[in-house]
Every structure is written in structure tokens, then in C-alpha cells.
């Protein structure tokens, strides 16, 4: 079913406006994918007709999603036939492998099934997460650095297109966990970051793109897997937090996803004592979590999936599929043993532990989603040309644009960036890692400046390290390009690398790699995070250094004590050039004293705020804003503020002329002005010194309202105004 994006957006706005405050039970927001279907007679008729044809055991089977390997062995084909013909499962999840094998098995399975199967996929960063030879998109932690969420929406649309191409209707993505624990062994870069608001925005943008492309999004891992140090694949993590903490961090993205009308939710294997007091009971099996919190309190009406029930985080809880359905889940994912677990559900109904109405309601919901996702009739994937359709030029361009939009300038001390193009001045490029990996960077840099390339090899001797440091010290600017992720062999060099010249670090690696050389990075004049060493990213970073391209990324997760979440300096082609003071005979140390002078003036009440700009030979040496507009509580002064300047003739005319003459030694500041202007010797100005003139303290009014002269026509003999231009007007 194709959903027009504008309609989805409109419905999102309606849905978002119907939710009450978090302190109250949320008003119901129907998921957008089924919003229209619930009023669609054809949908209800199809669901009713299928329900009438299914036995009760088959209705139970519709609630199970079986995981199978995409291989065409005899044993695997027999297993596929068994789970479809005997257990009548409602869906399949293929583990990793070849795309062609998965598609062939999907077509075979759909032909065998009595009711079209819901084909699911675990593709957090696209099909490449599970299938070889597919387009590789950036990880979520990288995408979290992108400011423009429209790109995330476009990304979701593209992943949906690819899923539909291979016969997939459900993607178990996005990860809505807030990764505020850097030691998290399982979520980490799968998360969009550590700011709950930013994570929520990214989740909604990506998931809305998926669903507008006709694929069900599934936010995971409810109620939040971000602040754990245990992998739920191996054991049961515990979230020992208060409810207030859960509401503000872990639950926040999920609540916003519900408000946005997204259709799927996966419950993780997590122990949350403040919600579920039974020790060792995972959220996926807890009615307090699934039904009371997710379905009732948060009013989620979409499809609820368990995380994979084969994981060790849920082991030791008896028949976990039965427990999951009793807790309120709609579909159980990856059951261990269908032969035991489906009969256990039927037996529980006979005992009154579950009602037939529960199963009927869940089955009806599953069928409604199948209808909406285009499964009202069987369809098959066309294998011919499939790989070319997925790996399209448009897809490659989107991957490129996502990577470029994530480039983040983490800091820019003394406005060292952008650099100015100057073929007469050579910049040193130190390449850390295989020099061939940063050839694209070096080639692009050479377009703007003369370049001297140096290579830092792993495990150099201290003598070799010192020779390299000495060589680099002869350059006025140094660019350090890091493409190597294991920096331990390079630490001895960086431990003593504190150059006097500005050093600009470029990381074509995950951001956390810079923590291995933290001291050197802290000393850097600028740090740019490129995330990957693709040629496109390298060329873009080179362009950003010279303001030939834009960069406006913001850090999605803090990097130790180096950079906080949200760090990011915007560089655009309009960013003014700044220059190194020493190259023009000035001292950076002296310029730093400007800060204390400007702040002292604010403390003494001379002015509420100011901007100080130092130029030399037309180049900006210093540009910094201090204080506020009018005092405490008013907006801060920014370098982009526009000023109404008055009395400029003194500073831009007379003062500059005097400064020039003084530099040439033509007078001393203690000279009397009449010594240089003889006509003043017979006036009361004869004893005034040049220094006193520069104080500008005559006591005259600060300005004269000349415009008032135009009000009184008698003040001027003649016509003040004319309807046309002439020699007088």
C-alpha cells in the first residue's frame, strides 16, 4: 500500500495534537498505517473473510514469526515447509546471507502459505546489515550528527523501497534507545545518540520515511536499552532507575514515536524493577511493562513484537512464547521450539490462562497490518535485474549525501578555519595510517595550497618520532589526517606532539578513536570528524577546511572530556577567513589579553557587551563577541550582530592616519599638537598633546540631531526638498 508523504505528515500533525501530558494516560493515537484501513470496508471484509477460513490453531500460528537461514539446502527447505504447513506461522525472519537465496525462499514460502506471510527484516542500517552486496548506509550514531532530519526521512523512504524490492513488509528498525552509557556493549553506534530529544526526532524522521514507503517501522528496544553494560543476547540487563528518570530519558523517544502515530514496537529483554518488581522477569514477558505501561498508560495501539525469544536474556522463564502473549505482545519473534510452544498456548487457553478473545483480537490486528502492507493477495519478487534496482545511482547518491551531511567541525579555536588559499605557503599533512587511504584528501588539498606530505608509521622509534616532530615544527600550519582506528602504536608520537603552529586534526574514523590520543586532540586548533575515509568524505572535508563546502554536523554522543553532545561549528562558503597572527607580525598571546580587557569593561559597567575585531592587511586576526545587549537577562552579543555605528570619522579616518604616522616614527604621543600644526600655536589648543586628543573627551554632545533642522524650514534659506534630482539636490 503506497502512502503519500504529505498525507502522512498531515495525519502526524493531527495525531501529535491529540496527546495529553505525560502525567496522564495518553489519548489514543491510531497508527498512521492503519488509520484509514480501520474505516475501510474492504479491509474489514478481507480480515473477516480470512478469520472465517482459519482454524483456531491457525489463528495462534499467525502470531508467530519464525527465523530461518536463507540457504537452499534440503534440510532448510524441509524446515520451511514444516513451519508453514504444520504450524501455519504468520511471518518469517531471515538471518544473514545472500540476497538471491532470501528472495527465492520468500517466493517459495509465499506460494506455500495459506495466508500471505509477513516477511520481516532486521535492517537497522539497511539491507547490508544482513545481506551481502547491498548498499551500506552510515550507522545511526553517525546519522545522529545530521541536523537536517529531512535526510533521515529520505533515508527511511529508500530503505522501504529496497525492502519492498526483496519482498519485505516489516523492518525491525529504528533503534530508539538513548545510548548514554559509552560502555554499552550492544547498542552503542546502533543508537542515534545520547540526547533523548535528538534521538526522538531522528527516530520519527526515519520511521516516518519507512512507513510512507509502505514498510512497517518497529521502534526498539522498549522501554530502553541505552544505559546498560550487559548484552541481552547473553544475559538480562537491569535498568535500576526511578520512574522519573525513565520518563525523561529511556521512555522519551518511544513516547514521541507513539505521539507521531508510528505503527510498530519491539519490547526488549530488560529488567526494570521500578515497573516490574518480580526479579529476573524481562520486560518482554512482563504484563506490567507490555500491557499496563505500553498499551494502557502510553496508549500504543500498533503492533507489538517481542525481541528474539532465542536470546539468553529471556531464558529460564518456562514457555516464553506463552508468557509473551499473556504479557500483551501481539507477535512473538524467533521462538525456540514451535512444536512445544504453539501447543502450550492452546493448552493455556483450555486452562483459562489466556482467552480465545485475546487470540482472536491479536490475530485480527495482525491481519489488518497484513492488508495495509499489501498482503491481501500473494505477490512474488522478480529476481531479474533485482541487484541493479537496489544498487541504483540514486541510492549511491543518498549514501554520499548522508555521509557528507554528518561531517562535524568539533571546534575551531581562534577561527583557524577556514584556511586561506595560498600556493606560496606550504602546509604540512601528517597521515596517520596507510598513506594511500588519504590520497583523496591530499589531492583535494593540493588544489588550494602547497602540500608537504608526511607519514606516521606504527611503532616508530623515539628517534624517528622526534625527527618527524622537528620536521613538522618548521611549518606554520599542520593538518593531521587519521584513518587508522587502532592508535595505540602511534601514542608515543602524540604524547610529545604539542606544536606551536596551529594543528588541525581530521578523523576519518568513528569519533571515539580520538580518545586514544586525547592530550594531542585537546591541544588542536581545530578538529573535524568525518566518520569514514570514503573518497567523497575526504574531498568534502578538504573543501570545508577552505570554506569551499559547508559542514554543520553536531556531535550525537559526547567524547569523554573532549567534546560534549551537540558540539559542532558551522562552516559555510560565506564564513569569513581568519589568519594566524604570527604570520603578520602579531602575537596570539597578546591578542588573548583582549578577553580580559573586554570583560573588565563589562564588569565595571562601561558597556553591557561588545565585539572586538582586529584586522591586519585586510585579514581578520581576531573576532570575538562579549556580554549581552543591555545587561543581565538580555540576548548575548554574537559576532553576526548588526550595529548602528556613529562617529566613525575619528576612528576610521583621523585615528588610522595617526597610527600610521606613529609607526613611522614621525611623532611621539606626548608631542603638542601645535608642534605639528603651527596655526594652532596662537589658540587655546596649543598645549593639547596628541595623546589627549586620542582620549576623545571634549565633553561635546555624543551626537547632534541634524534631522531636526529639516523640520523647521526657517532654519535654512532656500528649498530643503525637491521632487527631482538637480545640482542642489
Where are these regions (language model features)?
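Bacterial Sec-dependent N-terminal signal peptides
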Residues: 1-29
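Preference for extracellular/luminal or secreted protein segments
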Residues: 23-83, 296, 317-587
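Second-shell residues forming the walls of enzyme active-site clefts
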Residues: 55, 92, 102-117, 127-129, ...
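Short, acidic/polar
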Residues: 71-85, 152-162, 247-254, 316-323
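Short acidic, glycine-rich surface-loop motifs adjacent to enzyme active sites
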Residues: 81-97, 182-183, 258-281, 473-485
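Active-site-adjacent structural elements in enzyme catalytic domains
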Residues: 99-116, 147-167, 354, 359-364, ...
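Short, conserved catalytic-motif segment at the N-terminal edge
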Residues: 583-645, 666-668
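Active-site-proximal loop and beta-strand segments within enzyme catalytic domains
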Residues: 616, 628-729
Amino acid at each position: 500500500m503506497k502512502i503519500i508523504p504529505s498525507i502522512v505528515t498531515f495525519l502526524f500533525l493531527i495525531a501529535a495534537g491529540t496527546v495529553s501530558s505525560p502525567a496522564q494516560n495518553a489519548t489514543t493515537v491510531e497508527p498512521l498505517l492503519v488509520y484509514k484501513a480501520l474505516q475501510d470496508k474492504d479491509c474489514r471484509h478481507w480480515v473477516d473473510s480470512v478469520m472465517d477460513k482459519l482454524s483456531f490453531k491457525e489463528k495462534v500460528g499467525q502470531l508467530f514469526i519464525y527465523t530461518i537461514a536463507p540457504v537452499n539446502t534440503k534440510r532448510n527447505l524441509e524446515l520451511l515447509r514444516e513451519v508453514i504447513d504444520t504450524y501455519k506461522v504468520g511471518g518469517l525472519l531471515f538471518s544473514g546471507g545472500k540476497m538471491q537465496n532470501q528472495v527465492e525462499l520468500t517466493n517459495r514460502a509465499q506460494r506455500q502459505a495459506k495466508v500471505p506471510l509477513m516477511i520481516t527484516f532486521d535492517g537497522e542500517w539497511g539491507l547490508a546489515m544482513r545481506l551481502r552486496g547491498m548498499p551500506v548506509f552510515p550507522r545511526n550514531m553517525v546519522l545522529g550528527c545530521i541536523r537536517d532530519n529531512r535526510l533521515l526521512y529520505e533515508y527511511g523512504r529508500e530503505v522501504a523501497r529496497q525492502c519492498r524490492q526483496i519482498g519485505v513488509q516489516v523492518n525491525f528498525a529504528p533503534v530508539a534507545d538513548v545510548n548514554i552509557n559509552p560502555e554499552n556493549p550492544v547498542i552503542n553506534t546502533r543508537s542515534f545518540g545520547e540526547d533523548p530529544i535528538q534521538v526522538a526526532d531522528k527516530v520519527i524522521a526515519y520511521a516516518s520515511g519507512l512507513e510512507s514507503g509502505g514498510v512497517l517501522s518497529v521502534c526498539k528496544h522498549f522501554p530502553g536499552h541505552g544505559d546498560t553494560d550487559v548484552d541481552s543476547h547473553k544475559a538480562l540487563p537491569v535498568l535500576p532507575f526511578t520512574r522519573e528518570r525513565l520518563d525523561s530519558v529511556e521512555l522519551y523517544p518511544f513516547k514521541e514515536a507513539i505521539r507521531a502515530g508510528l505503527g510498530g514496537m519491539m519490547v526488549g529483554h530488560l529488567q526494570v524493577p521500578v515497573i516490574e518488581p518480580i526479579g529476573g522477569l524481562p520486560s518482554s514477558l512482563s504484563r506490567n511493562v507490555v500491557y499496563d505501561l505500553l498499551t494502557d498508560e502510553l496508549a500504543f495501539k500498533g503492533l507489538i513484537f517481542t525481541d528474539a525469544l532465542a536470546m539468553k536474556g529471556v531464558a529460564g522463564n518456562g514457555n516464553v512464547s506463552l508468557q509473551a502473549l499473556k504479557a500483551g505482545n501481539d507477535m512473538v519473534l524467533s521462538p525456540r521450539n514451535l512444536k512445544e510452544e504453539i501447543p502450550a498456548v492452546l493448552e493455556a487457553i483450555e486452562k483459562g490462562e489466556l482467552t480465545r478473545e485475546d487470540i482472536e483480537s491479536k490475530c485480527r490486528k495482525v491481519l489488518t497490518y497484513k492488508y495495509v502492507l499489501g498482503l491481501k493477495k500473494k505477490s512474488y519478487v522478480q529476481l531479474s535485474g533485482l541487484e541493479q534496482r537496489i544498487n541504483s545511482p540514486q541510492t549511491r547518491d543518498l549514501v554520499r549525501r548522508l555521509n557528507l551531511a554528518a561531517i562535524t567541525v568539533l571546534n575551531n579555536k581562534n577561527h583557524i578555519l577556514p584556511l586561506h588559499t595560498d600556493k606560496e605557503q606550504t602546509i604540512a599533512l601528517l597521515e596517520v595510517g596507510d598513506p594511500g587511504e588519504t590520497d583523496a584528501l591530499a589531492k583535494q588539498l593540493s588544489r588550494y595550497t602547497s602540500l608537504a606530505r608526511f607519514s606516521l608509521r606504527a611503532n616508530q622509534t623515539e628517534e624517528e618520532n622526534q625527527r618527524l616532530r622537528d620536521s613538522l615544527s618548521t611549518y606554520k600550519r599542520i593538518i593531521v589526517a587519521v584513518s587508522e582506528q587502532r592508535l595505540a602504536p602511534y601514542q608515543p608520537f602524540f604524547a610529545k606532539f604539542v606544536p606551536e603552529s596551529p594543528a588541525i586534526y581530521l578523523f576519518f574514523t568513528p569519533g571515539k578513536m580520538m580518545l586514544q590520543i586525547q592530550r594531542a586532540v585537546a591541544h588542536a586548533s581545530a578538529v573535524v570528524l568525518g566518520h569514514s575515509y570514503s573518497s567523497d568524505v575526504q574531498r568534502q572535508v578538504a573543501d570545508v577546511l577552505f570554506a569551499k563546502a559547508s559542514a554543520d554536523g553536531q556531535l550525537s554522543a559526547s567524547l569523554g572530556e573532549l567534546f560534549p553532545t551537540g558540539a559542532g561549528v558551522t562552516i559555510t562558503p560565506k564564513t569569513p577567513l581568519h589568519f594566524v597572527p604570527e604570520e603578520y607580525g602579531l602575537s596570539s598571546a597578546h591578542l588573548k589579553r583582549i578577553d580580559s580587557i573586554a570583560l573588565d569593561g563589562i564588569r565595571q559597567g562601561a558597556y553591557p557587551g561588545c565585539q572586538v575585531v582586529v584586522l591586519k592587511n585586510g585579514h581578520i586576526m581576531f573576532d570575538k563577541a562579549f556580554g549581552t545587549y543591555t545587561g543581565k537577562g538580555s540576548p548575548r552579543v554574537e559576532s553576526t550582530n548588526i550595529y548602528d555605528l556613529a562617529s566613525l570619522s575619528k576612528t576610521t579616518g583621523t585615528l588610522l592616519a595617526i597610527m600610521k604616522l606613529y609607526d613611522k616614527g614621525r611623532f611621539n604621543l606626548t608631542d603638542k599638537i601645535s608642534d605639528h600644526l603651527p596655526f594652532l600655536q596662537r589658540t587655546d589648543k596649543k598645549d593639547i598633546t596628541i595623546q589627549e586628543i586620542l582620549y576623545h573627551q571634549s565633553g561635546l554632545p555624543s551626537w547632534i540631531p541634524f534631522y531636526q533642522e529639516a523640520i523647521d524650514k526657517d532654519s535654512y534659506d532656500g528649498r530643503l526638498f525637491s521632487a527631482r534630482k538637480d545640482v542642489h539636490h
